[in-house]
């Protein structure tokens, strides 16, 4: 049916239709009509499949070739996940062996760590930031981050320096939150806001 329709379109227009591919013999001689060798027995040649066949066959061929190319893995080519899991197992075994060989040691803490423990007990619901600045600029940056920009009048500068340099709250890094709170209260006090 499709073939007869294409033949009638060819006779009226003089050009072969796009839907059905006709043989070159049809172009030369209008009386002889032949289908391609692979299209015998069908009324309408499968025109859409002819354009798709080569890429599909090449893709299938590549797929078959790549799946067949598998070599057994050596022990040297282990994945990163396997290496990490082995390392975790080794450390767990090492710790379990260490606990059975040596009894736990009693460690005495210094005065500073006891102070830090007191701070964590008093502020159980707040998260304590422990920052250990190596120089005063880092201490300044950290306190400015907590308090924001503060201004102290000349009358208040002596109290500020005493608080900033001599109190335990502003010299021990574990107490910097308290120091920030004290500095903001000092900046907002009547003595510092006057003049």
From Swiss-Prot:
Tissue specificity statement from the Swiss-Prot or TrEMBL entry: Highly expressed in the swim bladder and single cells of unknown identity in the head.
Disruption phenotype: Reduced number of iridophores in the eye. Fishes lacking alkal2b do not exhibit any defects in trunk iridophores in adults. Fishes lacking both alkal1 and alkal2b show a complete loss of eye iridophores. Fishes lacking alkal1, alkal2a and alkal2b are embryonic lethal and display total loss of iridophores.
Disulphide bridges: 156-192, 170-179
Assigned GO CC terms: extracellular space; plasma membrane
A Gene Ontology BP annotation from the UniProt entry: positive regulation of ERK1 and ERK2 cascade
Domain of life, source organism: Eukaryota
Main location: secreted
GO function terms (MF aspect): cytokine activity; receptor signaling protein tyrosine kinase activator activity; receptor tyrosine kinase binding
Cellular compartment(s): Secreted; Cell membrane
Annotated keywords: Cell membrane, Cytokine, Disulfide bond, Membrane, Secreted, Signal
Membrane-spanning intervals of the chain: none
Endoplasmic reticulum found in the keyword field: no
Role: Cytokine that acts as a physiological ligand for receptor tyrosine kinases LTK and ALK. Required for neural crest cell differentiation and iridophore development during embryonic iridophore development and adult stripe development by acting as a receptor for LTK. Also required for iridophore formation in the adult eye.
Family: Belongs to the ALKAL family.
Self-association and partners: Homodimer.
Protein name, as recorded: ALK and LTK ligand 2b
